[in-house]
Amino acid sequence: MIRIMLVDDQRFARLGFQLMLDDASDIVVTAQSADGRSAIETLEQLAVQHRPLPNVILMDVRMPGMDGIEATRRITRRWPTISILILTTYDEDDYAFGGLDAGASGFLLK
């Protein structure tokens, strides 16, 4: 079973990804956050509670507060086994490559 965490400040974007992933029998969305800081806090809570961490995080780059690039940098340092895929739009190539430099495994176009 692949455990996914969705991190995006747009609630409807998270809902859209959730609906797409619900159809996959071997994927489960285990957590959602609206920004990088709350994503890290959620991961810390899961770790303290000895609950399984996500295998993959789908991370938006442009969010208020802590953006996806900084969150990716911090998460990959602390939890290097979690794969992060940066979510970006066509006009955000610099953000996608910044995410890769921060430790993301790849990126997806929204």
Positions of predicted regions on the chain:
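Acidic catalytic/metal-coordinating carboxylates
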Residues: D35-S38, P64-E70
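Active-site T/S-Asp motif of two-component receiver
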Residues: L58-D60, A71
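Conserved acidic segment of CheY-like receiver
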Residues: M1-A13, F17-L21, I57
